[in-house]
C-alpha cells in the first residue's frame, strides 16, 4: 500500500486521526497517573519470629535454620538473608529478578504455606512467624504530627488515628501507616519486701491474673427450640477491677492486688521506636497511593482534607509535611512541560535555520503529533508519567524528527530539480520508507535490553523504552502520512536550473571527501588510533553506578555501638537535631529512632527494630545548599561523636545497600570469619578515601549470665524459670496478660518498684521465692556469674554464615576507583582457609547484576539489528561496514563526558545503547543511498560521493536536532551524564558517518577515483 499517496487521496481520514492524536494526547497528559518515579516491584518479603531468652546462636540453630531450609525449596527464590539476634530472627526472602509481577502474589501464598509447615518444628516458646510481603509499599506522602510537652502520648495517638481514619477515605489512597506510636501498658509495681511480708509469690500474681483475664468458651445449652450461648464475663473492665483482684498468699490469706501493688497506666519502656519533628515529639503518618493513580490530584485532595482537620487541632499540635511526593511529581511535570517546550523550540529553530521556515513548521508539527499519540497510547498500556518516562520524551525529541527530516529533504531536493510538489512529497516519503522503518526499528532495538533486563535497577528505566518505542514508531507512520499531507500545501521551493549541490559548502565538502578517500589507509589508522586512545582515557575517567538527585533533602543513618539502648540513641540524636535546627539553610528536621520510617521514597533502605539506630531526614530551603549542609553535618558529627557511625547521603534512584563497598566472608566458624574480616578492614584503614570502616556484625555485646546450679536450686526449691522470671520482673517487666479497652490491647506488666536501680552487683542479691513462699537470693541458686562479650547478631547469606568488611567512599572519592584499589589489596592480604570463600556485596553486586541483566539480552539485540540490516541491504559487506562504525562512538562519548565534566554511570550506559541505534540509523540512510545510486548505473566512486553529499543535511539535521534537543537534560542530576554521552557520541558519530564511513566503504569495495 502506498501510504503517502493514500494520505493525499484520503486527507479527511488522516485529518481525523491527527485530531485524535492531539486530543488524546491532551487528555492523556491530564489523566495519566503521575508519580515521582517509575514504579518497580520490590520482590522480597520479610519473616520475623521471636524466641525470648535465646542467644543469637540458639536463634540461628533452632529458628532461623529450620525456616530457611523450608523456604529454600520454594520456586524462584534468588537470595535468603537472615539476622539472628538475642530472642529474634529476621529473614528476608528475595525472588528471582526475572519473576513476572503476576506470579508474585501466588509465590507469597506459597511462602506462607511453607511457614505454616515449619511452625510445628520450631521450639516451644517461639512465636508464630509473621510474613510481611508489603515490604515495598511506598508511603510517598509523608507527614509528621508533633506536639509540645503539654500533650500526652494518648492524645497524640488519638489525633493520629483520627487523621488516619479520614485519609483512608480519600479516593486513590491505598494505605495509611503510623510510625512512632508509643505502646500503652498497665504497670503493676510491686516491692519484693512487701511480697515477702504478705507471703505472696510473683508466680501467684502471674497465675491469678492470667486465669482471671482470659476469655474462655463456656459452652451452650439447648432450651426448647433455642440454642443458648453461655457467656462467662470476668475480664477486667477497668483498672479498679484489676486492683480489686484477690490474691491468696502461701498462708491462705486473701489480699487485694491494690493493697500490695501500685497499678497505673504507662507506656512501654524502653520504647521500640520514637519520632521527633523539629524538636518535638511526633507520630509519622505515611500515605500510600494506589498504583496508576494521579498522585498530584490525590495529593491535592489529601492536602485539602488535612487543611480542614488541622484547623480543628488544639493549640500546640502541628502537622508538618516531611516528604510530599505529590508536590515533587507536580514540579517534575511542570519541568517536563518547560523542557519539552525548550526541546521543541530548539529542534524547530534549527530546522528552520537550515531547511527554511515552512520545513521547520512542517517537521515541528510532526513532533507534536508524535508526542500526542504517545501520550494517548500510554493510557492503553497502563503507563504513567514519571521521572523516567518524561526523560524518555526528551531523549526521543531529536529522533522523532529524523524520519520527517529525510522525507522533507527528499521532497525539497526533488522540487529543486523541477518535480511537481505532489509528486515530490509522495516519492520523497515512498522511496525511503523501508530504510526509514529499518532505521527506526534499529533505534528501538538498541534500547530493548532496558525493557527485557530482569533486574530492579533496569526496571526503573523500562518506561523509557516504552516511550521511545511508541514515539519512534509513530514518527515513522507520521512521516509517511502527515508529512506528505502537510508538505503538499506547505512546501514551496523554486526549481533551480543547475545542480542544487553546486554551492561553496558542497564544493568544499567534495574536496575534503576526495582527500579522505585518497588517504584512506591513513584515515583508517588515525581513527583506529583515536579509538584505542579513547578506550585508554575511558579507563581513567571517574565512574559511578547511580547519580545523586538534586532534591532539597538529605538523610542520615546513625548507628551507635551494639549494646546501646534507644535512650542512648535519643541523647545523641537530640544533640544532632539541635545543631541541624541552628543552621539557617535547614527548613525541617525529622528523626526516627529504633528503625527507619515508613518507606516514603522508593529507593530507601529499610532497617527495623534496632535500639541503637536512628534516621534523620533534613529538608533545606534551597536544593543548591543540600550538599554543603550535608558536608558540614558530617564534619560536625565526626568531630563531636567519636562512638557514632554516621552515613549521610543525598537521594539516589537505586536501592541503597548497607555499605557502598562490602567484602563478605562466608564460612562456619565465627572467630575465623572475624579474623578474615579484620584483615580486610585493616586494608581499608590503610587505603586513602575509605571511611565508615566497620564489621557487618558490629561489635561484640556484653553478656551477664547467672550460672544456675541444679543442685543448689533443687535444695532451696527454685527452678531456672523462676529465677529468670524474677530477673525479668526486676529489669524490664514480666507480661501477665492484656488489658482490653475498646479496640486497644495493653500489656499488663509486673515490675519491681525499684526496676531502675538494679545493677549487676545488686542483681546478685535479687530475692526469689520458692513454692512455699520462702525468700532466697539469686546467688543462692547459682554457681556464680559470668560476664562475657559475644556477637549480638549472626548474619547469613543463602543459609551460610557471612561476615562483611564494610566501608564507604569519602567525600569526593569515586566508589568504583576505591573498590578497584581495595579489591586488589584485599585479594593479596586475605588468605582464605579451606571451606571459606569471599563474595563482593554492596553497590558492586547491584551493578554487576544490572550489567549482567543488560548483557543477557545484548545478543538478541545484535541479532535483531543484523536481521534488519540484512533485510534492508541484502548483502553482508554493507552491514559489516555499518557495524564497524559502532565502536568508534566511544571517541565521542569520552569527548562528551570530558567536556561536560560528567561521570560515566548506569545512565551513561543507557545512552551508549541508544547511540548504537542512532549511529546505525544514520549509517543506514547513507549506505542505502549509495546502493540505490550504484544500482542506477552510476560509477561506484561517483555514487559514493554523490550519496554522501546528498545525505549531509538529513544526517546532520537528525544528529543536530537530537544533540541540541538533549540540552535541557544535560543539567538534570539523573540524566545529565546520559545526555552528555549521547551529545558527544552523536556529534562524533555524525562526522564518522559523512567522513569515515565512505572511506571504510571504499576500502571494502576497493572503490577508487576513475
Please name every model-derived segment:
Residues 122, 131, 135, 160, ...:
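Generic hydrophobic, helix-prone segments enriched in Leu/Val/Ile
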Residues 1-110, 114-115, 272-624, 632, ...:
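Hydrophobic regular secondary-structure detector
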Residues 4-7, 12, 30, 34, ...:
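A structural signal for conserved, well-ordered secondary-structure elements
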Residues 152, 386, 503, 622, ...:
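Alpha-helix initiation/capping motif
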Residues 6, 48, 119, 166-345, ...:
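Extracytoplasmic/periplasmic membrane-proximal domains and adjacent transmembrane bundles
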